[in-house]
């Protein structure tokens, strides 16, 4: 029940994550100690009969037996003593015994000297007192605890939600004031997992562990004293609330240890004196807490949080093949799939989607196994096949040439239907050197495959690394152009696949947060690593004008990170001494072992600084000024585009389903089908759309029934396959009928003409093809403009202007919708990417106009935006009296929706789907009367099948996402 209450208490705040750890009781004192200088033990250290914990490893005792079911977990029996190295995994901790290391379930162990009145094994409160008096008795058991706290340092007051006591910011229990006037200000560092190592000074500064460490409940040692507890009349004692450890900042740890390098790095939380009001401080504190859950190198960020979140853009390709077969290769990788001729029946197609997932699941790496390739996700659209397919790739390891190694370790392909496993071995069809081929039978809609080097008979202290030559890839990422101050990211991969782009999210105190920045791969280098060990990565510049920050010149990647195959990301800041003399230069990256021996080094030439004419203001305008329109230059990709011919022919790749229920709707909707039990409906795809029905959110298929395209509830359909049943009645679905049906909602969408005009001028290379698609065939250019136009973008704009005049002409009896005619023409030109950009902009703008004054309610449903952030969206649009006019309320709504859509990502389907769900959650949702957003969902989810049917495979190349 305590867990349910805390989840309810936190439901309006930031989501909980694994790093928050266990739940604790405020009635117990605890010291938040940190994991500093965590070290991986050597085999000899593990063989000692009575081992001593190394570094700050925490000793625990097993309370029940555990028998592992995979390579990465550690076997132990009740009463065994274990030493925990890392607890950031939440339910799984990384620990070692006297012989080996591995993951253990946190609920199966408890610390030594553990008091059963604080925590149970599962992180829930055990034997919780029933009254505040019992809490007082519990606190009195600590003996001199209340005296010790008087001598301790000042509690850090960086939590804006408590005056004097740092605890859950979303609760307002009474707290005992701190001794701010008696003690100097100290610093709190939040510690995170998966960071690089950086030096930091520990004088009077204290550290607060954000990983939710159960060991922080143990008595303090080495001069670390406990802080003053909260008052016993706290209302949350009476309600027996429990809190996550990362939400508690009540106590402070002090240490006189000398400065050390740690696997974890620090992030200073904002201080109250930096802000003018408590609300500003609250917003900054929330941003800081959000950052602390996801960043990889916190010490870089300091008081001004900078680039905190890095994510590799996983390489992905989608390709459609017919019965003649072919090959599909992931761009910039050596991973490909070969499809034999006759794989599918003539007239049918097979759509293959491949993605390289860079971080392997934990099950694939242990002492006896190591992953030597990325996890490859393969998705197939058609399972009615007659042949197998072949996966071919190069791996990052080779078995050593001696007979013993070849007999001990083999390269093995593992397959699973889920990314996290379990994985089952499948035989290799071909293996020579670092090239392997795998024959894939029993095809599934989604498969995950990985190559590992595995030796099931390896005995401790040997590991699989002793029998292979494993290559490690080091990549250096940076901005497209260098600037007076910029950041680079060094990544270490356990395989050959280094993506061309790395996304970096800059977390700031301003709202809204900026869109992610894409860093380019400047260069990469491979070297053979003999064993998983600590690696020190150093960076130097060859020019005196550029300096790598001195405290960032060396960072550490821990050995067990290498063993687990995780991608390591280290951020280095580079600063120019003279910003007026910018030029490209060379960066040298060194990788050293723990003995400071150079394992490898390589140099990378940086890009040039941006040309002066290319420097633009940071704020992005919605549309161009009039004098800028003529300066638009077409992209070279657009210039070479050839527009295919739209074919009006039957849509063949349909699936059919039998209707299990008769549905007649009281409230008629263009987008929800009515149907009879026993009839047959054609399904455009088996992808499901989520939206609210009469009472609750349901899942729907896009169906075609009796000449209408609409949604049908998935529970009312039994999918029977691709064979067309004889009972199917109604007109045949052709591409022109499908196009007309799905474009129905377009005429109800709002648009900004200047924005549409700019977008088309930038992306359409032929005014002639554009005019023909709009129905202005064989008309000369003079029909659209009087003066002679020099550039192609201006000619495209003149055709668009003519379309606008015709659609808005009141004398025209057959008035058409500008939006519908434009989208139809672009789809006939096979400009699907341009269409989805327009549709998403239309949807966001229309939603902003429809929601208007209720946009704050929508913002709370979509992103749980705070009141201060909402005020920040409205502030640019306030008048002299500080009020936003009701007719201008769409502007802050539109600004918010644009920012929110960038945070969702590049998937236009996800943006519109999540927007629909958010609108459905509102009180008296606008989707009840304005149902055209549902039609837009049908539109964007039908584009693929329309494109596949309207254009032959020879008309367009494979497209890469």
UniProtKB/Swiss-Prot annotation:
Record's GO cellular component terms? clathrin-coated pit; clathrin-coated vesicle; cytoplasm; nucleus
Task: Write out the GO biological process terms.
Answer: cellular response to amino acid stimulus; endocytosis; negative regulation of cell growth; negative regulation of cell population proliferation; negative regulation of GTPase activity; negative regulation of TOR signaling; positive regulation of autophagy; protein localization to lysosome
Q: Name one Pfam family in it.
A: SH3_2
Asked if the keyword Nucleus belongs to this entry, the reply reads: yes
Q: Give disulfide pairs as residue numbers.
A: none
Q: The SH3 domain covers which part of the protein?
A: 55-114, 652-722
Read off the InterPro entries from this record: DEATH_SH3BP4 (IPR056183), SH3-like_dom_sf (IPR036028), SH3_domain (IPR001452), SH3BP4_C (IPR056181), SH3BP4_SH3 (IPR035456), UPA_SH3BP4 (IPR056182), ZU5_dom (IPR000906)
Function summary: May function in transferrin receptor internalization at the plasma membrane through a cargo-specific control of clathrin-mediated endocytosis. Alternatively, may act as a negative regulator of the amino acid-induced TOR signaling by inhibiting the formation of active Rag GTPase complexes. Preferentially binds inactive Rag GTPase complexes and prevents their interaction with the mTORC1 complex inhibiting its relocalization to lysosomes and its activation. Thereby, may indirectly regulate cell growth, proliferation and autophagy.
Record-given protein name = SH3 domain-binding protein 4
């Amino acid at each position: 029940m305590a867990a349910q209450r805390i989840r309810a208490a936190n439901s309006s705040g930031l989501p909980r994550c694994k790093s928050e750890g266990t739940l604790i009781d405020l009635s117990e004192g605890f010291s938040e100690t940190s994991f500093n200088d965590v070290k991986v033990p050597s085999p000899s250290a593990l063989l000692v009969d009575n081992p001593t914990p190394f570094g700050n490893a925490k000793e625990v005792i097993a309370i029940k037996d555990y028998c592992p079911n995979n390579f990465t977990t550690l076997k132990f029996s009740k009463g065994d003593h274990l030493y925990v190295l890392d607890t950031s995994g939440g339910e799984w901790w990384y620990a070692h015994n006297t012989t080996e290391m591995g993951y253990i379930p946190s609920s199966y162990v408890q610390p030594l000297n553990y008091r059963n009145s604080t925590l149970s094994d599962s992180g829930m409160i055990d034997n919780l007192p029933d009254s505040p008096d019992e809490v007082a008795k519990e606190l009195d058991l600590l003996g001199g605890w209340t005296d010790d706290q008087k001598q301790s340092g000042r509690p850090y007051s960086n939590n804006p939600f408590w005056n004097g006591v740092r605890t859950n910011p979303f609760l307002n229990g009474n707290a005992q004031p701190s001794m701010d006037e008696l003690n100097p200000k100290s610093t709190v560092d939040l510690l995170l997992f998966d960071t690089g190592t950086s030096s930091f000074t520990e004088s009077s500064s204290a550290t607060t562990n954000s990983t939710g460490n159960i060991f922080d409940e143990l008595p303090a040692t080495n001069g670390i004293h406990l802080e003053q507890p909260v008052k016993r009349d706290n209302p949350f004692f009476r309600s027996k609330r429990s809190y996550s450890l990362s939400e508690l900042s009540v106590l402070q740890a002090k240490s006189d240890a000398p400065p050390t390098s740690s696997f974890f790095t620090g992030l200073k939380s904002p201080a109250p004196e930096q802000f003018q009001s408590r609300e500003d401080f609250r917003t900054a504190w929330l941003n800081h807490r959000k950052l602390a859950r996801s960043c990889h190198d916190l010490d870089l960020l300091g008081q001004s949080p900078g680039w905190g979140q890095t994510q590799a853009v996983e390489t992905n390709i989608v390709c459609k093949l017919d019965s003649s077969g072919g090959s599909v290769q992931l761009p910039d990788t050596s991973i490909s799939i070969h499809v034999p001729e006759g794989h599918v029946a003539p007239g049918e197609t097979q759509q293959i989607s491949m993605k390289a997932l860079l971080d392997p699941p934990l099950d694939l790496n242990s002492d006896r196994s190591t992953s030597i390739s990325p996890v490859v996700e393969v998705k197939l659209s058609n399972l009615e096949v007659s042949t197998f397919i072949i996966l071919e790739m190069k791996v990052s390891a080779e078995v050593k040439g001696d007979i013993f190694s070849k007999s001990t370790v083999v390269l093995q392909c593992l397959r699973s239907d889920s990314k996290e496993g379990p994985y089952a071995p499948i035989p290799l069809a071909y293996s020579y050197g670092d090239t392997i081929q795998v024959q894939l039978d029993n095809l599934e809609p989604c498969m995950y495959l990985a190559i590992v080097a595995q030796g099931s008979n390896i005995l401790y202290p040997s590991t699989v690394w002793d029998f292979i030559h494993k290559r490690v890839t080091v990549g250096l990422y940076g901005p497209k152009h260098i600037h007076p101050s910029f950041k680079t990211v060094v990544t270490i991969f356990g395989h050959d696949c280094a993506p061309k782009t790395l996304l970096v999210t800059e977390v700031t105190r301003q709202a809204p947060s900026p869109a992610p920045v894409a860093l380019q791969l400047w260069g990469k280098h491979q070297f053979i690593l003999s064993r998983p060990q600590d690696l020190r990565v150093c960076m130097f510049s060859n020019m005196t004008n550029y300096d790598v920050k001195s405290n960032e010149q060396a960072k550490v990647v821990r050995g067990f990170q290498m063993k687990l195959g995780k991608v390591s990301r280290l951020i280095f800041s580079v600063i120019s001494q003279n910003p007026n003399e910018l030029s490209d230069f060379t960066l040298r990256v060194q990788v050293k072992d723990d003995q400071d021996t150079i394992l490898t080094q390589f140099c990378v030439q940086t890009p040039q600084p941006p040309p002066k004419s290319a420097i633009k203001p940071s704020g992005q305008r919605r549309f161009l000024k009039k004098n800028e329109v003529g300066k638009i230059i077409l992209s070279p990709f657009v210039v070479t585009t050839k527009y295919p011919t739209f074919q009006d022919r039957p849509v063949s790749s349909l699936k059919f389903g039998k209707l299990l229920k008769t549905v007649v709707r009281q409230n008629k909707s263009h987008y929800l089908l009515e149907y009879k039990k026993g009839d047959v409906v054609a399904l455009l795809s088996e992808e499901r759309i989520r939206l609210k029905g009469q009472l609750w959110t349901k899942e729907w298929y896009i169906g075609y029934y009796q000449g209408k395209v609409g949604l049908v509830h998935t529970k009312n359909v039994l999918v029977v396959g691709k064979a067309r049943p004889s009972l199917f009645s109604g007109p045949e679905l052709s591409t022109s009928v499908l196009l007309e049906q799905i474009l129905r909602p377009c005429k109800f969408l709002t648009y900004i003409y200047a924005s549409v005009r700019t977008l088309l001028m930038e992306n359409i290379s032929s005014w002639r093809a554009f005019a023909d698609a709009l129905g202005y065939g064989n008309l000369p250019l003079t029909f659209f403009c009087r003066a002679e136009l020099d550039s192609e973008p201006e000619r495209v704009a003149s055709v668009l202007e003519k379309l606008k005049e015709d659609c808005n002409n009141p004398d025209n009896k057959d008035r058409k919708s500008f939006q519908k005619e434009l989208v139809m023409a672009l789809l006939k030109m096979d400009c699907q990417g341009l269409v989805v950009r327009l549709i998403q902009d239309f949807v966001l703008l229309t939603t902003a106009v429809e929601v208007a004054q209720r946009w704050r309610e929508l913002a709370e449903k979509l992103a749980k935006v705070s009141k201060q952030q909402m005020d920040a969206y409205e502030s640019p649009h306030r008048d002299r009296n500080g009020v936003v006019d009701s007719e201008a309320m769409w502007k802050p709504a539109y600004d918010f929706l644009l920012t929110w859509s960038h945070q969702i990502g590049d998937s236009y389907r996800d943006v519109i789907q999540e927007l629909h769900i958010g609108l459905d959650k509102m009180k008296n949702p606008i989707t009840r009367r304005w149902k055209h957003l549902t039609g837009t969902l049908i539109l964007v989810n039908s584009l693929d099948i329309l494109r596949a049917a309207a254009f032959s495979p020879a008309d367009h190349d494979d497209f890469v996402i």
